[in-house]
From Swiss-Prot:
Keywords: ATP-binding, Cytoplasm, Kinase, Nucleotide biosynthesis, Nucleotide-binding, Transferase. Pathway: Purine metabolism; AMP biosynthesis via salvage pathway; AMP from ADP: step 1/1. GO terms for biological process: AMP salvage. It catalyses: AMP + ATP = 2 ADP. Monomer. One of its GO terms (cellular component) is cytoplasm. This is Adenylate kinase. One of its GO terms (molecular function) is ATP binding. It comes from Aeromonas salmonicida (strain A449). InterPro entries: Adenyl_kin_sub, Adenylat/UMP-CMP_kin, Adenylat_kinase_CS, Adenylate_kinase_lid-dom, P-loop_NTPase. Pfam families: ADK, ADK_lid. ATP binds at residues 10-15, 123, 132-133, 200.
Length: 214
């Protein structure tokens, strides 16, 4: 079962990725983790990637595709894998297809921008422990204070509304076109494309995924 997850930051992909991994026993493949592992292992691709990164440049699609192919050939991917955060662009998706990487399911988590802004800009964190709250969905007992220590809660820079909106803009420019790409792939019978309403409660989304993935 080879799965690609699509959806804006804050759409709930991470939560459902955990559910899918546990239920189906397949690993989640993150390009960041792969890059770090390849650099640490000193593989040829890893050394190439390190040279590019040390020069302050972006790692090319060719190197990333090479890493993906290396990674999915490992024994723990025998029953499938879950790709999150890759491919991000149509050239990456095309290169993956050209490299013979088959995708069984593309799952798009659809959540309106304003809902994502509400979700992410409402997060509050206790710096000392990492405990996370939400002003709407999971408020602390005392506004702005950690339940355990009573210390102040902070907003992470990533969760500031302006940052969230910038990340959404990048997603719509770069990654949203993949929806069209994989839609066509599904029409051609090369994959199954499923759009999921990410505004549903978490357990409802998990149940829907269980029905889709079997």
């Amino acid at each position: 079962m080879r799965i690609v997850l699509l959806g804006a930051p804050g759409a709930g992909k991470g939560t459902q990725a955990q559910f899918i991994m546990e239920k189906h026993g397949i690993p989640q493949i993150s390009t960041g983790d792969m890059l770090r592992a390849a650099i640490k292992a000193g593989t040829e691709l890893g050394l190439n990637a390190k040279a590019v990164m040390d020069a302050g440049q972006l790692v090319s699609d060719d190197i990333i595709i090479g890493l993906v192919k290396e990674r999915i050939a490992q024994p723990d991917c025998a029953n499938g894998f879950l790709l999150d955060g890759f491919p991000r662009t149509i050239p990456q998706a095309q290169a993956m297809k050209d490299a013979g990487v088959v995708v069984d399911f593309v799952l798009e988590f659809d959540v309106p921008d304003e809902e994502i802004v509400k979700r992410m800009s409402g997060r509050r964190v206790h710096s000392g422990s990492g405990r996370t709250y939400h002003v709407v969905f999971n408020p602390p007992k005392v506004e702005g204070k950690d339940d355990v220590t009573g210390e102040d809660l902070v907003i992470r820079a990533d969760d500031e509304e302006t940052t969230v909106r910038k990340r959404l803009d990048v997603y719509h420019q770069q990654t949203a076109p993949l929806i069209g790409f994989y839609g066509k792939e599904a029409e051609a019978g090369n994959t199954r494309y499923v759009k999921i309403d990410g505004t549903q409660p978490v357990d409802q989304v998990s149940k829907q995924l269980a029905r889709i993935l079997g």
